[in-house]
Curated annotation (Swiss-Prot):
Pfam families linked: Acetyltransf_1
Name of the molecule in the record: S-alkylcysteine N-acetyltransferase
Keyword Membrane carried by entry: no
Example GO molecular function: L-cysteine-S-conjugate N-acetyltransferase activity
EC number(s) recorded for this UniProt protein: 2.3.1.80
Knocked-out gene: effects: Growth rate decreased by 4-fold when grown in presence of taurine as sulfur source.
Phylogenetic placement of the source organism: Bacteria, Bacillati, Bacillota, Bacilli, Bacillales
Reported induction: Induced by glutathione but not sulfate (at protein level). Induced by methionine and taurine. Positively regulated by YtlI under supply of glutathione as sulfur source.
Length: 178
């Protein structure tokens, strides 16, 4: 029987996390999508762990999925005033087994909504080169609040409301790069 553990990544996890991210983002690289996660190296992974909240799903001592939360106060130009998630990746051999969904649900409900009382969260993805990912987020309750066409792709910013009575749509804003 497998025991799943949710925890913050540490710098000691950097090497294993790099392998996970590189493996999971290989198909994205083949689509010519240039996200930081698609060109990650050990320094980038270490900095991501040190500067943000990189959460991992560990099963039987192995890191199988990860997602990072960036908070608005970590940057002078945050994507919005709500937490932003990125570097969401699951080892390919666990694809279709619900590991990524389990981790994302944990981050949305336990970490952001229940512990941090965040009214919403945001993320960015490709709507043209990687449309099935945007569709997956829509099925999970995310909505597009910003889109921009650039370099043959459509980048979209999406949000999910976690605490409706505390959500303020004006805090979404347009990303600084727009």
């Amino acid at each position: 029987m497998s025991d799943d553990i949710f925890r913050l990544a540490t710098v000691e996890d950097a090497s294993e996390l790099l392998k996970l991210v590189n493996s999971a983002f290989q198909p994205i690289r083949q689509l010519d999508i240039d996200w930081p996660s698609t060109r990650a190296d050990i320094q980038m992974v270490s900095e991501n762990i040190e500067h943000h909240s990189a959460i991992v799903l560990e099963r039987d001592g192995k890191l199988i999925s990860t997602i990072t939360i960036r908070f608005p106060w970590e940057s002078e130009t945050p994507p919005s005033k709500y937490p932003f998630v990125w570097w969401f990746a699951t080892l390919p051999e666990y694809k279709g087994q619900g590991a990524g969904s389990k981790l994302l649900t944990y981050v949305e409900e336990k970490v952001l909504r229940d512990m941090l009382k965040a009214p919403a969260l945001t993320l960015g993805t490709s709507a043209r080169k990687h449309p099935w990912l945007a569709d997956m987020y829509r099925r999970r309750g995310y909505e597009v609040y910003f889109e921009q066409e650039k370099d043959g792709d459509i980048g979209v910013m999406m949000h999910k409301v976690l605490i409706p009575e505390r959500f303020n749509p004006t805090l979404l804003g347009a990303p600084s790069w727009a």
